[in-house]
């Protein structure tokens, strides 16, 4: 939208904004925005509290305080009179008082007409001074042939009137062009200039005499004490020089304005490009010239500023302010406090200072005061305006309050967490929301949450009021509101009625990933706490120790449908991070299921036969058979589906029969904890538990091995298989087509119609889905039939109304999609029930001591005594003794752990052991502390970067371990020793959480605009994947199976016999992946995000499977944000401690953890420890020689690599290695570019310089995966690929060819390819550039959207560069659309697929006549 056409910004509809541009405001622009000049520093009258006329809150300028009230005469008008002029009095007509809403005070601006030009603070202080870069002032000092560049500081001194500049030499040799005249050398420079000028005039002339007098006075002043201390009078001497010659010397903003007026931008550009070409040649000749590299970078930056002004066509003089805008009054409010005190925004004080100084300058000028006084006043005015623009960045003279607090300027209102971008534009406060403490709601269904009645009454107040009035319970809104406030019992039935089909959204801070916000169906509870389903706590990372949650209410019908379809907890079963269920039972539920599935040999009732399941339950209730006894039931009682093919009886425990009874009839029977791939292993597994007729049950059972009960891991595997079996396969549209064909006469045969449907894989529906769908359909139709019959007889062939069909569709669709959750709810109920029945309790007597503990402790003490003896004799150093002692105590603790493990192995009745083995709570490490020894404790010594670089031993572990266990009790020393570690754990966690949150924020900014936008980009450029192997330990980090599952193949896959296993362009499912791996294939070429051709986005085939839905990703999915959340969310689990156990803090120890992750993602050039040396060539290691032979002081090695040059000649390259670095190669080894020669982290820039982008991508992927996998966290490759793609998305231009790029500019890789493609097609010279790697901190700052970049970091720098280049934001990303109030271009606002897993269309739309 062209903002030049309309200045009525307040009336622009946010939906009509298509793009936003920034430019330098001209003085005319400011006058056009303004509704009057502010010329008085007063705000409000201290008696009347009314705004002062012409002051900072003037109602005529900024709008009325009361709606539609004349600011002059006080007469009130109606809304219909808005924008009219008041003509009630003569004064009203003279002043042009306009009738406005008080909202005008939020957008009406004023201005201050400055009495001196003022340079905008941002343009000489931000990013090493834009003014300095643009002018590029140089001066030839003396006889020097090389010019000296005038520094940023010198220009700042000039702006603040501390020094003067020679603007015109007037032919005087003593004055060099652009020479900055500093106070220390002013006397000599002026003296030489005057001596040179005097020669122009004959002796005895008036001019000669005047100049001679001036020279004499100057000599007296410079030799006097005052002259030496305070310098000379610049202004008088400048006037003399200007009067008697054509030279000109000036200072302040006027001098800068003169220089900006004279600059020839195109000539400057040509000069810079020529200089750049010369520097570039020197660098190519000698790549080690660091100073030349720095010079080149400075020239790049200068060229960028010059180009910005040329391309935008703006006048650089517009960086000088003549009319200062005054922001609307309500954006810098003055608030009345108790009594007659007022609190005001800091901006008002800053504006006040400007107005006072501006008025004073005006008076001095009118009084023709001496130049020095006027210049001083101009300097003070410059400082006052600077303080208003950016008070924080002022190095000196910050404007402060009485208490010494710097005042908040306009820049502070924009930047930081509390600034306009992040506080008000990206994050807003929400109406219809509340918060309360959460408690467990074990009786809730998965899609439900308990909402306190009081909260519901307030949140749904408008709907309740409407209901009360409609049902004539009250006569007015006021009465209804009073009734709700008083909690009148009449309202509760209406509250219950109103909340039907109105979902609520729950959010728990910190919102680390999308599962921290989920939706539920509200269930009213009488308490004051929100009740939460126990299975969804994992997604929220919530517990019930006082956590609070926020509640939000979606209001519009579209928002409600979106919430129900996309955000309901029963739709968020899988975690997006790894595609595994996140709703697995834990704690009490696991303990209950563990207890339920236990088997006991010889238990009461073992071998009993029951004819029915109910008879077995009755016997259990009468206690004639135990829960853990193995009994026999007829096959058809348990699995009627399979009974048709298998006959006989089934053996299991009473508990396992109860457990299996909650699963659908066609789900495999669970006999033991071997639950991997139940469907595949079922036939072989079932044989030993099925007995033919006539078998002696008791005898057979006695010989049968007792099975292990189900632990947490086994239950998680069962949940996964339940999801795979019963997760929805159809689209809503498919079920609608069946409902459309049914009536009350044929609904019983709906299964025939369902059999014709095909799932999203184009396959027939499996039997479990057919049976469940027909069951739901028959039930809902019969219910509707009964309901209609209450109003009279219903014909069987009656055609259903559209709204009836829509209602049926909603109910069947909900039940169909809720199949998995209904089973999970049954598992949850069973777990809680049997954990209660188990009566599990613990006592101190349950803790059994480690049998051989004291033997191990004795062994350790003897070893330590030996070490001390060796140290005393000087055989080992103190550091070596410390390292060996730590290693020994670590081994002793491991031995005690193993001993304890053996002693509790068969103790299945011990409650503590049950909790540990089931995975409900605690692990062997906790048990060792209770019953073995506490072990080594952390010290408060921190490993520093310098320790890692110098391989120092860091004593971060207390050498003397805590030998006692909690059962024995700690000694006073041991207790004191363990306090360090306990506190360190808590502080680390707190720091970790903050750093992890910051990492997530940066990653979101990096990848926020990556959305799935197309079906296929038709890229034929693949990505070869294989097992990610840690070359140091030779262990697999990520297996090939995980890397190819859910991805599209780029090439056909054949086995060793040439048989095709999978075709190119197909998505690899789990079975195909297993087949490929089983065939022994080591490498597979897949489609990858790293090779997707879509600009700033990705296509479905390059992305593959959406892990959260377990099917192909939908168009509109914001995969960039999901990737950022998936990498950032587990960040808190990554330990920030280095992994060394008190030994040498070397590189190997610091390979994992949060620190290394940040190094990789931010592309650090100085990582922890000594960086690895890498091979720059393809070659062979021919020699590894010892450096000590040549120079004893420098110990180390020289590695000689023999390689072939481009001319195929043999050459040698020698690399120096320090002695402390561990070699990874030997003589005769072949090396490739980028290969590590020694241990240590690789610097990403170095790797990119010697190899290619693909090598760097593989290295980053491997390293990031290794960090997470070491902590047991699995993250999908595709998320890391998205971040890597963004890190390598920029190209630096080295030759611009015929393109519009300029040398040194950093451009997006897709723009670079697009421009080059066009140039090549037109037979023109393409541009050449190098791919550069940028860290996550810098990528958002290089965004094409200045709104997205400015809302991230360095706001003022981004805005300055956007302004000088008149940048246009096309609002393509997510952040910028949120800022302007648009819907984001993703999800349901993009080209959303109708036949996806979730459908947000109105159910009526499927049955509308015009839709058929």
Swiss-Prot record:
Pfam families: RNA_pol_Rpb1_1, RNA_pol_Rpb1_2, RNA_pol_Rpb1_3, RNA_pol_Rpb1_4, RNA_pol_Rpb1_5. CDD domains: RNAP_beta'_C. Mg(2+) binds at residues 543, 545, 547. GO terms for molecular function: DNA binding; DNA-directed RNA polymerase activity; magnesium ion binding; zinc ion binding. Its cofactor is Mg(2+); Zn(2+). The RNAP catalytic core consists of 2 alpha, 1 beta, 1 beta' and 1 omega subunit. When a sigma factor is associated with the core the holoenzyme is formed, which can initiate transcription. PANTHER family: DNA-DIRECTED RNA POLYMERASE, DNA-DIRECTED RNA POLYMERASE SUBUNIT BETA. This is DNA-directed RNA polymerase subunit beta'. The lineage of its organism: Bacteria, Bacillati, Mycoplasmatota, Mycoplasmoidales, Metamycoplasmataceae. The gene is rpoC.
């Amino acid at each position: 939208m062209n903002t030049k056409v309309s200045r009525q910004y307040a009336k622009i509809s946010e939906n009509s904004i298509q793009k936003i541009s920034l430019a330098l405001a001209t003085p005319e622009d400011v006058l056009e925005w303004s509704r009057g000049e502010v010329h008085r520093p007063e705000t409000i009258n201290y008696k009347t509290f009314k705004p002062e006329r012409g002051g900072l809150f003037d109602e005529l300028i900024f709008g009325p305080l009361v709606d539609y009230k004349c600011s002059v005469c006080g007469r009130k008008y109606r809304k219909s009179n808005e924008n009219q002029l008041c003509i009630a009095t003569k004064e009203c007509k003279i002043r042009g008082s306009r009738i406005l809403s008080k909202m005008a005070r939020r957008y009406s601006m004023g201005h201050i007409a400055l009495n001196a030009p003022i340079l905008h603070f941002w343009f000489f202080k931000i990013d090493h001074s834009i003014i300095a870069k643009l002018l590029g002032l140089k001066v030839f000092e003396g006889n020097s042939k090389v010019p000296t560049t005038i520094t940023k500081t010198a220009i700042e001194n000039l702006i603040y009137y501390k020094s003067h500049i020679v603007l015109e030499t007037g032919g005087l040799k003593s004055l060099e062009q652009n020479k900055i005249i500093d106070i220390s050398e002013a006397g000599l420079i002026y003296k030489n200039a005057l001596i040179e000028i005097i020669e122009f005039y004959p002796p005895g002339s008036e001019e000669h005499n005047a100049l001679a007098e001036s020279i004499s006075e100057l000599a007296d002043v410079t030799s006097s004490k005052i002259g030496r201390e305070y310098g000379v009078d610049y202004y008088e001497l400048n006037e003399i020089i200007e009067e008697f010659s054509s030279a000109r010397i000036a200072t302040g903003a006027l001098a800068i304005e003169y220089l900006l007026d004279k600059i020839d931008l195109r000539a400057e550009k040509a000069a810079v490009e020529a200089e750049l070409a010369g520097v570039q040649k020197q660098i190519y000749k000698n790549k080690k010239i660091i100073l030349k590299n720095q010079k080149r970078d400075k020239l790049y930056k200068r060229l960028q500023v010059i180009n910005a002004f040329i391309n935008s066509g703006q006048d650089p003089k517009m960086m000088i302010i003549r009319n200062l805008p005054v922001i609307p009054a309500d954006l810098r409010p003055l608030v009345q406090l108790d009594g007659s005190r007022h609190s005001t925004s800091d901006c008002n004080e800053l504006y006040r200072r400007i107005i006072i100084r501006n008025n004073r300058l005006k008076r001095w000028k009118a009084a023709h005061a001496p130049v020095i006084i006027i210049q001083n006043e101009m300097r003070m005015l410059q400082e006052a305006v600077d303080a208003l623009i950016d008070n924080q960045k002022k190095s000196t003279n910050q404007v402060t309050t009485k208490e010494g607090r710097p005042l908040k300027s306009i820049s502070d209102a924009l930047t930081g967490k509390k600034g306009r971008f992040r506080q008000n534009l990206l994050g807003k406060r929400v109406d219809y929301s509340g918060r309360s403490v959460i408690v467990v709601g074990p009786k809730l269904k998965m899609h439900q949450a308990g909402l306190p009645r009081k909260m519901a009454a307030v949140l749904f107040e408008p709907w309740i009021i409407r209901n009360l009035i409609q049902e004539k319970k009250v006569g007015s809104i006021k009465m209804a509101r009073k009734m709700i406030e008083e909690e009148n019992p009449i309202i509760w039935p209406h509250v219950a009625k109103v909340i039907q089909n109105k979902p609520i959204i729950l959010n728990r801070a910190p919102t680390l990933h999308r599962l921290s916000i989920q939706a539920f169906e509200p269930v009213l509870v009488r308490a004051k706490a929100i009740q939460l389903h126990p299975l969804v706590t994992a997604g929220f990372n919530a517990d019930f120790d006082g956590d609070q949650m926020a509640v939000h209410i979606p209001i519009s019908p579209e928002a409600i449908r979106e919430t129900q379809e996309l955000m309901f907890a029963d739709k968020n079963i899988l975690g997006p991070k790894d595609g595994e269920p996140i709703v697995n039972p834990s704690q009490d539920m696991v303990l209950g299921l563990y207890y339920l599935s236990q088997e006991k040999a010889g238990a009461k009732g073992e071998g009993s036969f029951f004819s029915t399941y109910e008879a077995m339950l009755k016997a259990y209730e009468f206690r004639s058979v135990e829960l853990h006894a193995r009994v026999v039931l007829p096959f058809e009682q348990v699995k009627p589906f399979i009974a048709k093919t298998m006959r006989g009886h089934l053996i299991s425990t009473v508990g396992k029969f109860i457990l299996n009874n909650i699963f659908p009839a066609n789900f495999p029977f669970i006999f033991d904890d071997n639950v991997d791939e139940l469907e595949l292993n079922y036939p072989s597994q079932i044989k030993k538990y099925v007995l033919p007729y006539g078998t002696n049950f008791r005898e057979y059972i006695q010989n049968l091995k007792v099975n292990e009960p189900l632990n947490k891991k086994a239950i998680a595997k069962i949940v996964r298989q339940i999801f795979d079996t019963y997760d929805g396969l159809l689209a809503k549209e498919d079920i609608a087509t069946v409902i459309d064909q049914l009536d009350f006469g044929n609904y019983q045969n709906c299964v025939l119609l369902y059999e014709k449907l095909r799932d999203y894989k184009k396959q027939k529906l499996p039997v479990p889905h057919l049976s469940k769908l027909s069951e739901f359909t028959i039930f809902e139709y019969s219910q509707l039939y009964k309901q209609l019959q209450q109003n009279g007889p219903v014909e069987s062939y009656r055609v259903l109304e559209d709204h009836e069909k829509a209602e049926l569709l909603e109910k069947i669709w909900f039940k169909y999609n809720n199949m998995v959750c209904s089973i999970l709810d049954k598992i949850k109920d069973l777990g809680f029930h049997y954990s209660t029945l188990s009566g599990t309790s613990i006592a101190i007597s349950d803790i059994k001591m480690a049998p051989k503990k004291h033997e191990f402790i004795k062994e350790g003490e003897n070893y330590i005594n030996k070490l001390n003896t060796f140290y005393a004799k000087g055989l080992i150093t103190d550091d070596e003794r410390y390292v060996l002692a730590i290693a020994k105590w670590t081994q002793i603790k491991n031995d005690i752990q193993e001993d304890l493990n053996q002693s509790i192995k068969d103790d299945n009745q011990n409650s503590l052991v049950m909790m540990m083995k089931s995975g409900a709570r605690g692990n062997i490490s906790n048990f060792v502390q209770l019953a073995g020894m506490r072990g080594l404790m952390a010290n408060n010594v921190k490993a520093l970067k310098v320790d890692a670089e110098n391989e120092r031993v860091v004593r971060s572990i207390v050498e003397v371990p805590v030998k006692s266990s909690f059962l024995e009790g700690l000694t006073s020393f041991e207790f004191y020793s363990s306090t360090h570690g306990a506190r360190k754990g808590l502080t680390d966690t707190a720091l970790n959480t903050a750093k992890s949150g910051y990492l997530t924020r940066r990653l979101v900014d990096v990848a926020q605009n990556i959305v799935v936008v197309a079906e296929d980009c038709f890229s034929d450029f693949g990505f070869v994947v294989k097992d990610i192997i840690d070359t140091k330990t030779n262990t697999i980090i990520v297996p090939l199976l995980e890397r190819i599952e859910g991805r599209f193949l780029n090439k056909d896959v054949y086995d060793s016999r040439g048989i095709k296993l999978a075709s190119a362009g197909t998505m690899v499912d789990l079975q195909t992946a297993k087949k490929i791996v089983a065939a022994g294939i080591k490498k597979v070429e897949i489609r990858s995000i790293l090779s997707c051709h879509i600009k700033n986005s990705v296509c479905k085939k390059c992305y593959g499977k959406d892990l959260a839905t377990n099917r192909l990703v939908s168009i509109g999915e914001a995969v960039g944000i999901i990737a950022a959340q998936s990498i950032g969310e587990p960040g808190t689990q990554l330990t920030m401690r280095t992994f060394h156990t008190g030994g040498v803090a070397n590189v190997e120890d610091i390979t994992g953890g949060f620190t290394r992750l940040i190094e990789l993602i931010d592309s650090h050039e100085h990582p922890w420890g000594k960086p690895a040396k890498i091979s720059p060539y393809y070659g062979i290691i021919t020699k590894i020689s010892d450096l000590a032979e040549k120079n004893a002081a420098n110990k180390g090695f020289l590695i000689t690599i023999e390689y072939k040059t481009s001319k195929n000649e043999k050459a040698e390259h020698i690399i120096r290695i320090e002695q402390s670095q561990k070699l990874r190669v030997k003589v005769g080894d072949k090396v490739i570019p980028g290969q590590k020669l020694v241990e240590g982290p690789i610097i990403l820039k170095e790797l990119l310089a010697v190899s290619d982008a693909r090598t760097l991508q593989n290295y980053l992927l491997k390293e990031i995966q290794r960090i997470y996998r070491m902590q047991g966290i699995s993250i999908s490759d595709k998320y890391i690929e998205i971040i890597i793609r963004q890190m390598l998305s920029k190209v630096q231009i080295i030759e611009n060819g015929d393109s519009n790029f300029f040398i040194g500019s950093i451009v997006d890789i897709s723009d670079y390819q697009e421009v080059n493609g066009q140039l090549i097609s037109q037979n023109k010279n393409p541009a050449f550039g190098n791919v550069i790697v940028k860290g996550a901190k810098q990528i958002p700052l290089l965004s094409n959207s200045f709104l997205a970049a400015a809302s991230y970091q360095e706001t003022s720098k981004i805005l300055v560069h956007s302004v000088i280049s008149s940048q246009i934001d096309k609002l393509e990303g997510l952040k910028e659309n949120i800022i302007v109030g648009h819907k984001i271009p993703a999800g349901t606002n993009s080209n959303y697929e109708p036949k996806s897993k979730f459908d947000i269309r109105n159910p009526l739309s499927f049955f509308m006549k015009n839709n058929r």
